[in-house]
Amino acid sequence: MFERDTSYPTAVASNDDEGVDAAIEWCLKQMKTGDTFTVWTSLKSNLKNCTSLERLVQRYDDVVHITGRGGEIPRAPGPVLMVWPDIDEIGQLVRFARQIRALCIITWNADGIRPWVTAMKPEVLGDGSDWEKLSTDLDPVVIEALRSLTLTINHNNTISAGYEKDQVVSVLLALKEAHVSMDADAMQGWVLAHGWSGKNPERLARYVQDINDGKRPRAQRALRADYVDNLRKKATPVETNIDESEG
C-alpha cells in the first residue's frame, strides 16, 4: 500500500576513473529536456575528493549537488548519482522516488550495498569484479512474506510503532517460530528494491537481527496458525501434468 515506484533504471559504478566517467555518461544519457542532474554526497566536502564530479557541478547549471547530512532532496526530476552511500542512505534518498528518473551508485564499500545490488540487479559500470559474488539468496517463503507485507503496510508510516509494526513483527516472529531462515541484510536489500524507503528497510533489518538473536519485539497482531504453511504453498511452484495423446 502506497509503496514507492522503483522501476526507474539503476546502475552501480566502480570507484575509479573508469567507473566515475561511466557513471557520469550513464546519467547524462538518462536526462530528458528540462531535467536536473543531481549529484549526492553524504558531506559537502566529499565532492572535493572527486575532481571530475566537482568540475561537473561547477560547470553546468542543470547539475546540482546535494548532501545527505543536510537532509537535502532532489529538487527536480532527473537522474541521481549517489557517491559512496551506504545502504541506509540509499533508503533515505529513495523516499523521493517521484523525482528520480534514474539512479546510479558509485561504490565505496561493496559489501555495504551488496544486498541492494543483489535485489535490484543494476547495470554494472566500470570494474565489475566487486559483483562477481552477490548476497545469499532469500528463502522463497521469506520472499512471499515480504511481498505480502509490501502490499499490506502503509509505506508513508514508520514500522517502529502502531499497525505497521504489528504487521511486520508478527510476520517475522511467525517465520522464526517455523524455523524459516532469515538473513537481515538480504531482506533489507530486497525491500529497498521493492519500494520500501526512509528508515523502514533499516528497521526491518534490525527487527530480524533481534529476533534471530532470541529477542521478541512486542506485537499485538495474532496470525493464523496456518500462516506460514500458506506462504510455503505460494512459494512452491505448481507442477502441471500435460497428457499427450497421439493422433
Briefly describe each language-model feature range.
Residues 1-247:
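Short, flexible loop motifs at catalytic/binding sites
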